Amino acid sequence: MNSSFSAPAKKSLGQHFLADRYYIDRIVQAVDPRAGQHLVEIGPGQGAITFPLLRRHGALTVIEFDRDLIAPLTEVAAPIGALSIIHRDVLSVDFTALANGTPIRLVGNLPYNISSPILFHALDHAAAVADMHFMLQKEVVDRMAAGPGSKVYGRLSVMLQAYCEVTALFVVPPGAFRPPPKVDSAVVRLVPRDPATVQINDRRRFADVVRAGFGQRRKTLRNALSTICEPAHFDAAQVRPDARAEQLEVADFIRLANVELA
């Protein structure tokens, strides 16, 4: 049963509403909600994923910025289950406070125009997040899951993989959306790593090293990091200064950022 409703997509908000039942079902199966879990959907849109999740789980929190969608979401959800709506910009939502001691499971068809900021915002609250299932542009998912040596391996790959296990699940074609986007989409699963296993001494320092390394990716690390790393940093971290950022494993970046010279 499809309980979603029709509403015009707003280009200014980067809206593309999922409409294909096959892919809706695949996403719900991938999330596989269980009793007692706290599900939070970012950008429910017309409710394509919202209502199947609500029907299966009984309770759901959604974060929606478009005020025109609040009333129809509330109306359609009423006979299905308990829907709690947060009408705010997702980047202003404190996921840690929302979790309130029970790790949340984040789900969403993320707006293409702000997908990366949302990902980094979720990372800031990783300790309060059990897992994430997001649909994004396929090229973004490819970058998220890429490994060293890949042309698309970069800052996003390292920053996300340092804190999460990243798994690309499946591709969703443009025809599954209304209106159809110009590119393929893909669904990705992110599972935050146990904080005790993420040995990053200074998150800001780590982010600076990764940003600088990939900021001039064709340069050697010696040159790209010349303002923030001395030769002794490379020696202590056992990282070759003549290597390029795209050749380093995530663990290499972590070791390099963790070096503290006397």
Curated annotation (Swiss-Prot):
InterPro entries: KsgA/Erm, rRNA_Ade_diMease-like_C, rRNA_Ade_Mease_Trfase_CS, rRNA_Ade_methylase_Trfase_N, rRNA_adenine_dimethylase, SAM-dependent_MTases_sf
Broadest EC class assigned to this enzyme: transferase
Record-linked PROSITE patterns: RRNA_A_DIMETH (PS01131), SAM_RNA_A_N6_MT (PS51689)
One Pfam family matching this protein: RrnaAD
Compartment annotation: Cytoplasm
Gene3D superfamilies on file: Ribosomal RNA adenine dimethylase-like, domain 2, Vaccinia Virus protein VP39
Disulfide bond entries: none
Residues reported in the UniProt entry to bind S-adenosyl-L-methionine: H16, L18, G43, E64, D89, N109
SUPFAM superfamilies (UniProt xref): S-adenosyl-L-methionine-dependent methyltransferases
A GO CC annotation given for this chain: cytosol
Taxonomic superkingdom: Bacteria
EC number per UniProt: 2.1.1.182
UniProt catalytic activity: adenosine(1518)/adenosine(1519) in 16S rRNA + 4 S-adenosyl-L-methionine = N(6)-dimethyladenosine(1518)/N(6)-dimethyladenosine(1519) in 16S rRNA + 4 S-adenosyl-L-homocysteine + 4 H(+)
Family that this chain belongs to: Belongs to the class I-like SAM-binding methyltransferase superfamily. rRNA adenine N(6)-methyltransferase family. RsmA subfamily.
Function: Specifically dimethylates two adjacent adenosines (A1518 and A1519) in the loop of a conserved hairpin near the 3'-end of 16S rRNA in the 30S particle. May play a critical role in biogenesis of 30S subunits.
Database matches in NCBIfam families: ksgA
Protein name (database record): Ribosomal RNA small subunit methyltransferase A
Organism (species): Xanthomonas euvesicatoria pv. vesicatoria (strain 85-10)
Lineage: Bacteria, Pseudomonadati, Pseudomonadota, Gammaproteobacteria, Lysobacterales
